[in-house]
């Protein structure tokens, strides 16, 4: 029986049938080699796995080592035994990590949002933004409801009838009372910054302080004819040196949409911002290898700084457990369940891809500082497209505060139980709505959620002075809040990526999406006497030399 000769491809290379005898012989030899060196093969797989996840393991180990080191130094005398100079040197590596991360937040947020908004057509941009805001709103409401339910079930403030004065740190200042209207006006002021050119304006937010002033009023004093003096509290908006992420987000999105409207004329500027963003991500990859050292000393320094940490855990242990349990349930059950229901993918594999940003969030206690690492991990390890992650994650770092909303609800119920106040249905609904709304304007900075807790307490007529008890342990609870906040941002980006993959969202100009990868920059042709430098040649994809055209450059 004749056997057909092997066929050749157009390039003249003979194709080899993988089912031929030589292929089976090669496969059997490989199997024999694998069986002979099975131990070595498994050892190599373990080494490859460790090398691939080295940064994750180092970051988690650094966080655990920071807790152990901090407790050990506290047992040996703490910050007082070290002295001011030694404690400053002890905490300096952690401070350096924060400064490195904050250094690249400004270019990263601006460039990523401009590139992401410009890469999507207006209809797709609107749909993505609407779905993202809906996801953030639903998850924040769920976290608020979970916080209220846990606080009502565990009753953390019922057994806290008498508080020892040593529980409250003397260095903690009481948070001032803030009106709801002033908080809303602050949100609007920060959305529209007055100056983006000044270097300090981007790192400046508006805040309202209350100043007590004596006012002369006309009138007759009962004891004689003299003007009366009354004391009044007046609101006084001022600027604080904190990064105005909300203002940068609003400006960058609007500017990116404007570049999209320009069409080809704005393509060069879009490519500039994309290249700037890629260079910033290279800096992020370098900083990530310093993150374990910084996280170790950040966590250890904060524990050493606290006074009488044992008494704090004894007095407020039930409140801490309630907050941490709520964050664990929402982060390990609720968010993964939502992700699985909509994507049908393993959510815990997605979580493993963002372990490094989660550990960084625990160490830095700042959603904004974790943003660069989160962008890099969701793109490289979880397969989220750049124009989605760089558009959604900065918005999530500003408006998505699941952890803060849960903590605020637990704290409000805790203070209500502490003061013996019963919460009816109307007050519970008030707590849920106020916590969800106020968490949107909470700054992505350490202790940002505590600043908005006063709004909830004022809404249900609770004393604001009890916030000092919350501040005493906020250094721990706030880290758990930050981990949950950034986890919600990452799951939101993953859900939107799945939505885009299912719907195959069209774009009116696909070449604007990731211009750097799709448009190759070729060197300009040599100038000739007959050639016009303002003319460029366009060749058809077929490569036919006769099919050439000339048109005036749009650049």
Swiss-Prot record:
> Is Cell cycle set as a keyword in this record?
no
Q: Which domain of life is it from?
A: Eukaryota
Q: Which residues lie within the membrane without crossing it?
A: 348-378, 428-461
Checking Gene3D superfamilies in the record gives: Sodium:dicarboxylate symporter
Keywords of the record, alphabetical order, are: Acetylation, Amino-acid transport, Antiport, Cell membrane, Glycoprotein, Membrane, Metal-binding, Phosphoprotein, Sodium, Symport, Transmembrane, Transmembrane helix, Transport
Keyword Membrane listed? The answer is yes
Its family remark reads:
Belongs to the dicarboxylate/amino acid:cation symporter (DAACS) (TC 2.A.23) family.
Q: Where is the signal peptide?
A: none
Q: Name one GO cellular component term.
A: membrane
Function, in words: Sodium-coupled antiporter of neutral amino acids. In a tri-substrate transport cycle, exchanges neutral amino acids between the extracellular and intracellular compartments, coupled to the inward cotransport of at least one sodium ion. The preferred substrate is the essential amino acid L-glutamine, a precursor for biosynthesis of proteins, nucleotides and amine sugars as well as an alternative fuel for mitochondrial oxidative phosphorylation. Exchanges L-glutamine with other neutral amino acids such as L-serine, L-threonine and L-asparagine in a bidirectional way.
Q: How is its activity regulated?
A: Down-regulated at acidic pH.
Sequence positions bearing Phosphoserine:
507-508, 520, 545, 553
Modified sites of kind N-acetylmethionine? 1
Cite the InterPro entries for this sequence: DAACS (IPR050746), Na-dicarboxylate_symporter (IPR001991), Na-dicarboxylate_symporter_CS (IPR018107), Na:dicarbo_symporter_sf (IPR036458)
Q: What is this protein called?
A: Neutral amino acid transporter B(0)
Disordered: annotated segments: 534-555
Q: Show which residues sit on the Cytoplasmic side of the membrane.
A: 1-52, 118-131, 263-271, 343-347, 379-387, 497-555
- Compartmental location: Cell membrane; Melanosome
């Amino acid at each position: 029986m004749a056997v057909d000769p092997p066929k050749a491809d157009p390039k003249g290379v003979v194709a080899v049938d993988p089912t031929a005898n030589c292929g089976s012989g090669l496969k059997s030899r490989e199997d024999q080699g694998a069986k002979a060196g099975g131990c070595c093969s498994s050892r190599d797989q373990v080494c490859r796995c460790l090398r691939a996840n080295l940064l994750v393991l180092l970051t988690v180990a650094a966080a655990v080592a920071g807790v152990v080191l901090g407790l050990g130094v506290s047992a040996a005398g703490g910050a007082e035994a070290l002295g001011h100079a030694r404690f400053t040197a002890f905490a300096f590596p952690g401070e350096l990590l924060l400064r490195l991360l904050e250094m690249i937040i400004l270019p990263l947020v601006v460039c990523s949002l401009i590139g992401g908004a410009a890469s999507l057509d207006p209809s797709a941009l609107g749909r993505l933004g609407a779905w993202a805001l809906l996801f953030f709103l639903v998850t924040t409401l769920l976290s608020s409801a979970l916080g209220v339910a846990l606080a009502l079930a565990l009753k953390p403030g019922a057994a806290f009838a008498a508080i020892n004065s040593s529980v409250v740190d003397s260095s903690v200042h009481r948070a001032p009372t803030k009106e709801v209207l002033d908080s809303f006006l602050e949100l609007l002021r920060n959305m529209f910054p007055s100056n983006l050119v000044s270097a300090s304006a981007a790192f400046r937010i508006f805040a309202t302080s209350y100043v007590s002033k004596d006012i002369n009023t006309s009138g007759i004093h009962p004891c004689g004819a003299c003007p009366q003096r009354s004391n009044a509290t007046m609101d006084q908006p001022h600027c604080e040196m904190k990064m105005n992420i909300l203002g940068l987000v609003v400006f960058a999105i609007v500017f990116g949409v404007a570049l999209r409207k320009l069409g080809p004329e704005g393509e060069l500027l879009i490519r500039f911002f994309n290249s700037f963003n890629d260079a910033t991500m290279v800096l992020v990859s370098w900083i990530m290898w310093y993150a374990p050292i910084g996280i170790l000393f950040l966590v250890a320094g904060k524990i050493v700084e606290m006074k009488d940490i044992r008494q704090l855990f004894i007095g407020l242990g039930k409140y801490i457990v309630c907050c941490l349990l709520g964050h664990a349930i929402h982060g390990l059950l609720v968010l993964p369940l939502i992700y699985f229901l909509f994507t049908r993918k393993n959510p815990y594999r997605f979580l493993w891809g963002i372990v490094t940003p989660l550990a960084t969030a625990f160490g830095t206690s700042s959603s904004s500082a974790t943003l660069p690492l989160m962008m890099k991990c969701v793109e490289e390890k979880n397969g989220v497209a750049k124009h989605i992650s760089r558009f959604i994650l900065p918005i999530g770092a500003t408006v998505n505060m699941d952890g803060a909303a849960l903590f605020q609800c637990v704290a409000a119920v805790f203070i209500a139980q502490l003061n013996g106040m019963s919460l009816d249905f109307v007050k519970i609904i008030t707590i849920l709505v106020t916590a969800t709304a106020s968490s949107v304007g909470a700054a992505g900075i350490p202790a940002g959620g505590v600043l908005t807790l006063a709004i909830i307490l004022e809404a249900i007529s609770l004393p604001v002075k009890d916030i000092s008890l919350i501040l005493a342990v906020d250094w721990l609870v706030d880290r758990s809040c930050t981990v949950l906040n950034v986890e919600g941002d990452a799951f939101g980006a993953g859900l939107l990526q799945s939505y885009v993959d299912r719907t195959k969202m069209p774009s009116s100009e696909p070449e604007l999406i990731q211009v750097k990868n799709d448009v190759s920059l070729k060197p300009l042709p040599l100038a000739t006497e007959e050639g016009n430098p303002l003319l460029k040649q366009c060749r058809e994809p077929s490569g036919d030399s006769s099919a050439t055209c000339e048109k005036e450059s749009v650049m």
